[in-house]
Amino acid sequence: MIDTTLPLTDIHRHLDGNIRPQTILELGRQYNISLPAQSLETLIPHVQVIANEPDLVSFLTKLDWGVKVLASLDACRRVAFENIEDAARNGLHYVELRFSPGYMAMAHKLPVAGVVEAVIDGVREGCRTFGVQAKLIGIMSRTFGEAACQQELEAFLAHRDQITALDLAGDELGFPGSLFLSHFNLARDAGWHITVHAGEAAGPESIWQAIRELGAERIGHGVKAIEDRALMDFLAEQQIGIESCLTSNIQTSTVAELAAHPLKTFLEHGIRAGINTDDPGVQGVDIIHEYTVAAPAAGLSREQIRQAQINGLEMAFLSAEEKRALREKVAAK
């Protein structure tokens, strides 16, 4: 179902949600961190979703073991490098990795700015080694409040040329976008793109707010847009992208089953929506699974899957010249 003549992208992929179970085990041993299991087989149920979680917050707790073993900046650098290696193994030509340095720093009180620098270094080395093109999106973890988000923002601004966009993720219901207006004003002043997790746990009003108040050019998940016809019209007319994550939305119980996922309707409505993974290490899936298993199960035709693949590059935070060069590079193969 993947068109090999087109670039394959993943533009909604959490770096800190893609820490390999084997790496968690190895870092736990290296830093003498107590883990819930001592073998890979017995650890996996603790760090990957085995059965669907009741809600988004429950799903997010699965990520915690991955960041609990980040006891040094070298560990952060390693997982960033491995994220690029995983992208290469998946056949991705371009990936946008998003990460929350405050979340990654929390367990061992690492310097937030140091985490940002370590991630930049690891991703840069990975791109050199594996030939994948990547850009970084900075996440503010709304769950930790406005002050913590300000600290993350300042760490990103210290490396503003290495950050492509700003995102807001975490507890959407408890911490609405209205709390973070000043943060996004600073992000736009820095010349960054804006993408916001919205319409996943909260309703369509969260998406409207992300667009109107925070300046979102893309929406992470955005499944609740299906409840507002005027919003769907607006998304299509303004070419505001929806970063769909099929399996993730089932695992968080945001959508009951793949057959009920709104991605097919979004595409039929002319919305620029694409297929992405979200937290592949925690989910136990990869981009190939999303295209070949999840998308057909969500009712997408072969042509709709191809359109979603095209949309992935169109939505990417790349210049027109960068997109053209990537298309030509893939076509030449």
Swiss-Prot record:
**Superkingdom of the organism of origin:** Bacteria
Q: Which Gene3D superfamilies match?
A: Metal-dependent hydrolases (3.20.20.140)
What CDD domains does the record point to? Answer: ADA
Query: Which keywords fit this entry according to its UniProt record?
Result: Hydrolase, Metal-binding, Nucleotide metabolism, Zinc
Cofactors needed by this protein, per the record, are: Zn(2+)
Annotated transmembrane regions? none
Cofactor note text: Binds 1 zinc ion per subunit.
Q: Does the keyword Metal-binding apply?
A: yes
| Enzyme Commission (EC) number | 3.5.4.4
UniProt record, GO biological process: adenosine catabolic process; hypoxanthine salvage; inosine biosynthetic process; nucleotide metabolic process; purine ribonucleoside monophosphate biosynthetic process
Molecular function (GO) terms for this protein are: 2'-deoxyadenosine deaminase activity; adenosine deaminase activity; zinc ion binding
The residues listed in the UniProt record as binding substrate, with positions renumbered to this chain, are H14, D16, G170, D279
> What does it catalyze?
adenosine + H2O + H(+) = inosine + NH4(+); 2'-deoxyadenosine + H2O + H(+) = 2'-deoxyinosine + NH4(+)
Q: Which Pfam families does the record associate with it? A: A_deaminase (PF00962)
| GO-annotated cellular components | cytosol
**What NCBIfam families does its record include?**
aden_deam, PRK09358.1-1
Q: Which family does it belong to?
A: Belongs to the metallo-dependent hydrolases superfamily. Adenosine and AMP deaminases family. Adenosine deaminase subfamily.
Its biological function? Catalyzes the hydrolytic deamination of adenosine and 2-deoxyadenosine.
Output this protein's name: Adenosine deaminase
Q: Which organism is it from?
A: Shigella boydii serotype 18 (strain CDC 3083-94 / BS512)
